[in-house]
Every structure is written in C-alpha cells, then in structure tokens.
Amino acid sequence: MAEILLDSDVIIAWLRGHDPFTTLIPDLLEREEVLTWTPVSVAEIFAGVRTGEERQAENLFLVLETQILSAEIGRKAGQYLHAYSKSHGVELADAFMAATAHVNRIPIWTLNKKHYPMRDVRFFSSSP
C-alpha cells in the first residue's frame, strides 16, 4: 500500500469527470492505495468549486486523507520559495505541496511537473 499526494489539478480533473482519472483513481482506491491532499489543495478546490460540484467536493473528505502541515513543512516550503520563486516562478501553494511530499517521502501526482523544479521531489506516474 503506497501513499500518493494528489495535486489540485488531478483532483479537479477527477471531479469534472475527465479521463483517465475517472478510472485510474477508483482503481488506485480499490487497490488500497492511500490518496492524500493538503489543506492548501482543499482551499484551492473549494475556491474553484462550480455550481453542482459542492457535494462531490465534500465527498472528497471521505476518500482522501488530509496531510497535516507542520513547522518542518513550512520551513521546507520557505526554502523552496527562496530557491525557486524568482528563477522558476514557484508559488506558495506549490512550495507547500512539494514540501509536504518531501517531508513525508511520498510522490506527487500532478499534471504540471514544471511547477516543481525541486530535485528532491518524487512524482507519481500513472503509466505502467
């Protein structure tokens, strides 16, 4: 059983019924993979929820485990911002996502790897 940190873009694609997420995510859950999100992703999802998506968004709490943000994660996010905000345009949300993945030693599943230029962050690939 592995743990995977879902980026907001993957969660949104799943919520909106985009393939291949509508089959991949249920398959992962069936295999008892632990799918997680951060409080930052929770905020991003609820900020952009469309009319009619509210119930689906609330149901995410039933299937996704929420990572806890800690001082260690905050420190690492600050280091990422210091190193990559000017050169790569890394923003606060992505710095927290990367720091959460790094500190907890779990891969990020994202559609935008360019948002994560950090060399010490691993990525989940849905490809075989």
Provide a role label for each language-model segment.
Residues 11-12, 42-45, 74, 116:
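A generic structural signal for short hydrophobic patches within well-formed alpha-helices
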Residues 31-32, 63-64, 104, 119:
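Structured helix-beta-strand junction loops
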Residues 1-37, 46-62:
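Short, well-structured N-terminal submotif of metal-dependent ribonuclease cores
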Residues 66-111:
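Active-site neighborhoods of divalent-metal-dependent phosphate/nucleic-acid chemistry enzymes
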Residues 1-3, 98, 102-128:
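Acidic, PIN/NYN-like endoribonuclease modules and their adjacent C-terminal/linker elements
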Residues 36, 67, 124:
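General small-molecule cofactor/ligand-binding pocket signal
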Residues 7, 37-38, 90-91, 112-113, ...:
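Histidine- and aromatic-rich ligand-binding microenvironments
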Residues 17-18, 48-49, 80, 119-122:
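Residue-level signal for well-ordered alpha-helical positions
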